[in-house]
């Protein structure tokens, strides 16, 4: 999810009427790397909408996050690669088309093409009325369903001003943590995307204060030249508890 949609380097090259020579080189290099990226090719082969699916796949396979019957909330779900991966994990082997052993709810400001079995809410996660829609989606005849797993690929539109960008990133992660505290099962898990830099240590401290186990991860599908990383928090805890790291 992009809180304010931001252009990719490809979009910038296409939409900008004037591109500097240096900018053209950067965009050409990005396009070359993207086209030849093994995860891009694998995503196309396996039917995923984005290479990001393999980031979640590695995290899941390393930590065993997704289990049959789980209720999963995907924050920043567009274009849908993470929801696709969860959808496949929750489909029983040999199941008929459309059969799903669990629940998946995606949320994003941007529209998302439908995925069978995935409920989607379009809206800004920061807005109370959008959170209310998410609450309603979790409601059943027996009351509110507690969530097993919250996955967040939310990211703000970066301005290039480090202090402002850091504050936006911190705010989104704080909202994801607050949602997990309010709607997740005590033994549930939260996975968030964030970036090394200003505000990173603050978010690690927040996770340590909130979860029994905290694990920073940089999946192989995250580009090596990117500051992107992920934090995994397992098991909600009381503030007084200490937090070990996963080995």
UniProtKB/Swiss-Prot annotation:
Question: Any idea which positions bind S-adenosyl-L-methionine?
Answer: 80, 82, 108, 124, 153
Q: What is the E.C. number?
A: 2.1.1.166
Its Gene Ontology molecular function terms?
rRNA (uridine-2'-O-)-methyltransferase activity
Locate the region Disordered: 1-21
Which residues are catalytic?
193 (proton acceptor)
Which reaction is recorded as catalysed by this protein?
uridine(2552) in 23S rRNA + S-adenosyl-L-methionine = 2'-O-methyluridine(2552) in 23S rRNA + S-adenosyl-L-homocysteine + H(+)
Question: Could you tell me which InterPro entries the record lists for this protein?
Answer: RNA_methyltr_RlmE, RNA_MeTrfase_FtsJ_dom, rRNA-MeTfrase_E, SAM-dependent_MTases_sf
Keyword Transcription regulation listed? The answer is no
Instruction: Name the SUPFAM superfamilies for this protein.
Output: S-adenosyl-L-methionine-dependent methyltransferases
Q: Where in the cell is it found?
A: Cytoplasm
Entry keyword Transferase = yes
Q: Would you tell me the Gene Ontology cellular component terms?
A: cytoplasm
List keywords of the entry alphabetically.
Cytoplasm, Methyltransferase, rRNA processing, S-adenosyl-L-methionine, Transferase
Query: Where does the source fall among the domains of life?
Result: Bacteria
Q: Where is the composition biased (Basic and acidic residues)?
A: 8-17
Family assignment from sequence similarity: Belongs to the class I-like SAM-binding methyltransferase superfamily. RNA methyltransferase RlmE family.
Its biological function?
Answer: Specifically methylates the uridine in position 2552 of 23S rRNA at the 2'-O position of the ribose in the fully assembled 50S ribosomal subunit.
- Protein name as catalogued: Ribosomal RNA large subunit methyltransferase E
Q: Identify the species of origin.
A: Polaromonas sp. (strain JS666 / ATCC BAA-500)
Q: What is the gene called?
A: rlmE
């Amino acid at each position: 999810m992009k809180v304010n949609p931001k252009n990719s380097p490809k979009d910038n090259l296409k939409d900008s009427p004037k591109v500097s020579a240096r900018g053209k080189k950067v965009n050409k290099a990005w396009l070359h790397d993207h086209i030849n990226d093994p995860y891009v090719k694998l995503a196309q082969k396996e039917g995923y909408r984005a290479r990001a699916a393999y980031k979640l796949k590695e995290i899941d396979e390393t930590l065993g996050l997704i289990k049959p019957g789980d209720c999963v909330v995907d924050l920043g779900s567009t274009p849908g690669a993470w929801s696709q991966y969860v959808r496949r994990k929750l489909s029983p082997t040999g199941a008929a088309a459309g059969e799903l052993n669990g629940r998946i709810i995606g949320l994003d400001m941007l529209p998302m093409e439908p995925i069978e079995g995935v409920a989607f809410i379009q809206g800004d996660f920061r807005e109370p009325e959008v959170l209310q829609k998410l609450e309603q989606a979790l409601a059943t005849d027996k009351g509110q369903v507690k969530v097993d797993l919250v996955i967040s690929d939310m990211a703000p539109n970066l301005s290039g001003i480090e202090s402002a960008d850091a504050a936006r990133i911190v705010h989104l992660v704080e909202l994801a943590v607050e949602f997990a505290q309010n709607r997740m099962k005590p033994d549930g898990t939260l996975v968030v995307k964030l970036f090394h830099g200003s505000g990173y240590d603050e978010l690690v401290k927040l996770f340590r204060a909130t979860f029994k186990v905290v694990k920073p991860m940089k999946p192989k599908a995250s580009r090596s030249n990117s500051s992107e990383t992920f934090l995994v928090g397992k098991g909600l805890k009381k503030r007084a508890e200490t937090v070990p790291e996963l080995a």
